Amino acid sequence: MPVKLKKIRRENPLDRAQVKWYLVQEKSGSVGMSRIVRDIRDRSAMTAGDVKNVLTNLVELLPVYLQMGQTVNLEGFGVFRIIVSSAGTQTAEELTIRQAKKPKVAFAPSKDLRQGLEDITYEIIT
């Protein structure tokens, strides 16, 4: 099934006379935990409760590992890591914890996941 794309018009915020057209994905909804649990249950020997328990534990443990400074590699899926940046200072002495910004979670998809999307097809809708 092709991914549906729509054409949108965007103005340059610095020069409203400059207009370009872009393709963006038409959203078709979202998949929640219950759907994922049901689909995994249907393709495995696990019960829905077992699947949900595993996924819930993963969601709970992921931040624990990341707070320990670990990267989390879910083979075949991808790698999660924390990115921390800070405001710049003129000297190292001025640099304190106060300049640290809130951490962000970065996700890098695995080669397997990227390859799973190579055969994607598109359709432009009007």
Where are these regions (language model features)?
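Strongly charged
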Residues: 1-126
